Each structure stands twice: as structure tokens, then as C-alpha cells.
Amino acid sequence: MSPTAGLGLKSQHYAEALASDAEGLWFEVHPENYMAAGGPRLRWLEAIREKRSLSLHGVGLSLAADADPDPDHLAALKTLADRFEPFGVSEHLAWSTHRGAHQPDLLPFPRTRAALDRVARNIERMQDVLGRTILVENPSLYLPLTGHDLDETDFLIELTRRTGCGLLVDVNNVFVSASNLGYAAETYLDALPAEAIGEIHLAGHGPDEGGSALLIDTHGAPIAESVWALYQRLIERVGPRPTLIERDDDIPAFDVLMAERDRAHGMLTPSAASRL
């Protein structure tokens, strides 16, 4: 079956998601929102899973932290994955915990060789517990850090080589980082090996409300035309990949998100584009 486009599943859209008859539609959820023994969220997810494929996109394992992944979190993730059998599981190349304290954000780190060893070890631990390979997502960056030993693309490629993991390419993150740090998004994307790319994310960004020239990865706006253009260029090079429309803030009506999803779906399946 050819790769298709999906939506990030939001609780206000459960009923419409369940009722939708869109061709090839799948949904992605943050597993942290479903790590419970029961309740209405899990019941909705079970009903939707009976009709649709799912993927799990984690935000809490802190793969770049200077400690092993939380074993309780990993165990809960495995329980959820075993229950819902997602076609993919992914996490971010970032850290959010330090010495037991949790930060409410996905934070960058110097890409040193020691960090490469640490992240690779944490990915291997995650994959061993889950019994499957995972995808790792590129971050969005705002300010340059010092102390790097490797470019970000080289760091990601080496992670795939060492651990067998794949890449989740967030095209909006690439655009935002390239704009903020002054490099070419096209060059970054061209450096990623096609065979490693397992999924693509598309999302919106906006200006810094503080008045700086920075772009912020808000997940709270429509996908920019510049990001759509990068996406088209990427799939022309690597071929179709499962593609997710992400919206986590200022969430519009289901049909508004479905319009973006249908656009991506048409780009993945040119024969469908003429019917949109």
C-alpha cells in the first residue's frame, strides 16, 4: 500500500475522526496522553483504531538527557504500543529532564561525540524495550549553540547507522531552524539519506511575539507555502512517505485540518490529486 497522509488526533475531533471515510487517513497521538488504565480517551482511541492505523509520537523520553530513559515511562509506552499496534513509534532528538526535574519543552544540546554515544545508547534501550525500531525527529532551533563536533545531519545519520533507527523529518522544523540559524533548508534536506526517512511531519510556524526576527515552531498556524514547497521537493527526491499534519495550538475545525491533510495526500498520490 502506498504511503498516505494523516492527522494528529485531538480530543475535540474524536467523533469526526471516527466518522470520517477519507481514503488512507491515519492518526498520530502523543502516547503520554493515553498512559492510563482506562477512561474515555482510551475508549475513543480503541474505537478509532478499529477503523484506522495509528502511530505514536512521544514527547517525554528525553533521549538526549544525561540519564537512561525513565523505565516506568518506557514500560507504559510498551503497554500502549502492544495494545494498539501502531505502524510507527517516534521520539524527538532533544532533552526535557535533568536530575529528576522535568522541563516543559524540548531542549537542544551540543552535538558532541559524547552526546552521540549517549543518545545512541538511549535509542537502543528504547528499541530493546519496545521490540521495534523507532524514528527520531529533527528539532527546531532558535539560537546557535557552541561546542558541536558534528553537523545536525551528520549526527542524525550516525544515529541511524549505529542503532538502526529511522528518521522522522519535520519539514517545518528544518525551515524554522534554517531561517533562524542562517543556512539553506534545501541543503539540509538533501543530506538526509532517503532510505532512512520513515515519516514526514508538516506544521505551521509564526513570528516571535517578542519582536525578534526569529521564527517560532508554534504548531498553531496553517502550513506555510514555503514549507509546502520544501515538502514537494523532498518527496520528489525520496519518494512518498507517510506524512502527518500537526496542529497542537489554536486548533481549528476538523474540516480545516482535513483540507491540509488532503493536500498532502494528493501530493503523495498524484492520481488522487485530480480528484481533489
Curated annotation (Swiss-Prot):
Pfam family, one: MbnB_TglH_ChrH
Family membership: Belongs to the UPF0276 family.
InterPro entries given in the database record: MbnB/TglH/ChrH, Xyl_isomerase-like_sf
Protein name: UPF0276 protein Caul_0757
Biological source species: Caulobacter sp. (strain K31)
HAMAP family: UPF0276
